[in-house]
């Protein structure tokens, strides 16, 4: 009951296959240079973009650029991802925070003059100056004042009365002497 040569050869081949798989898993990563490095960075980083040197927050004294890291030394996925740019998030980007409204939600108008399309941005309000309804109110007030002024001019007396009292000038009128 000894081990035959065929069984020992089978065991040796199985061991070599297992050893080669383990070595392939733990071997150093490959090096990337030039166009291959750029293509790999574009694939890994996608729309975020990438840096050839790390951002200033990650710099230490012995920091190297990605070319020195990946072309002359080994390079792996984790190292490549450290050179990806952070996605720029706009302050007005609200796509991440979606508000779910109930199905029975109805929007009621706030007021006649404060519709959302007329009051979009403060810069537009400043460019427009006074809102139309305030200009109309001011115009109505000015129109009333002008009408009152015209009415006062149209109702002038037919005879112009003296502005000063005749008694103060020293002249006596005939009515004052007969009393």
From Swiss-Prot:
Glycosylation sites: 106, 154, 163
Lineage: Eukaryota, Metazoa, Chordata, Craniata, Vertebrata
Record keywords, A-Z: Carbohydrate metabolism, Cleavage on pair of basic residues, Disulfide bond, Glucose metabolism, Glycoprotein, Growth factor, Hormone, Mitogen, Osteogenesis, Secreted, Signal
Stretches the record annotates as D: 86-91
Protein name as it appears in the record: Insulin-like growth factor 2
InterPro entries (alphabetical): IGF2 (IPR022334), IGF2_C (IPR013576), Insulin-like (IPR016179), Insulin-like_growth_factor (IPR022350), Insulin-like_sf (IPR036438), Insulin_CS (IPR022353), Insulin_family (IPR022352)
Residues excised as propeptide: 92-179
Pfam family, one: IGF2_C
Gene Ontology CC annotations of this record: extracellular space
Location of region: B: 25-52
Complexes and interactors: Interacts with MYORG; this interaction is required for IGF2 secretion. Interacts with integrins ITGAV:ITGB3 and ITGA6:ITGB4; integrin-binding is required for IGF2 signaling. Interacts with IGFBP2.
GO biological process: embryonic placenta development; embryonic placenta morphogenesis; glucose metabolic process; in utero embryonic development; negative regulation of muscle cell differentiation; negative regulation of transcription by RNA polymerase II; ossification; positive regulation of activated T cell proliferation
SUPFAM superfamilies per record: Insulin-like
Species of the source: Ovis aries (Sheep)
Signal peptide: 1-24
Location within or outside the cell: Secreted
PANTHER family reported for this sequence: INSULIN-LIKE GROWTH FACTOR II
Principal subcellular localization: secreted
Bridged cysteine pairs (disulfide): 33-71, 45-84, 70-75
Region of interest called A, as start-end residue ranges on this chain: 65-85
Modification after translation: Proteolytically processed by PCSK4, proIGF2 is cleaved at Arg-128 and Arg-92 to generate big-IGF2 and mature IGF2.
Site positions (Important for interaction with integrin): 48, 58, 61-62
Additional remark text: The IGF2 locus is imprinted. Paternal inherited gene is expressed, while the maternal inherited gene is imprinted, hence silenced.
UniProt region (Disordered), positions on chain: 160-179
MF terms (GO), sorted A to Z: growth factor activity; hormone activity; insulin-like growth factor receptor binding; integrin binding; protein serine/threonine kinase activator activity
Protein's gene: IGF2
Record region (C): 53-64
């Amino acid at each position: 009951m000894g081990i035959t040569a065929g069984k020992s050869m089978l065991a040796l081949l199985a061991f070599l296959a297992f050893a080669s798989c383990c070595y392939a898993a733990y071997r150093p990563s490959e090096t990337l240079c030039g166009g291959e490095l750029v293509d790999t960075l574009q694939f890994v980083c996608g729309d975020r973009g990438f840096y050839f040197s790390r951002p200033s927050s990650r710099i230490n004294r012995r920091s190297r650029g990605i070319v020195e890291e990946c072309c002359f030394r080994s390079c792996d996925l984790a190292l490549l991802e450290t050179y990806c740019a952070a996605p720029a998030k706009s302050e007005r980007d609200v796509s991440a925070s979606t508000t779910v409204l109930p199905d029975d939600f109805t929007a009621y108008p706030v007021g006649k003059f404060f519709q959302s399309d007329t009051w979009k941005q403060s810069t537009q309000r400043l460019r427009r100056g006074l809102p139309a309804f305030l200009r109309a109110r001011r115009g109505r007030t000015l129109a009333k004042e002008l009408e009152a002024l015209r009415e006062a001019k149209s109702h002038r007396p037919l005879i112009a009365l003296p502005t000063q009292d005749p008694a103060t000038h020293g002249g006596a009128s005939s009515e004052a002497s007969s009393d």
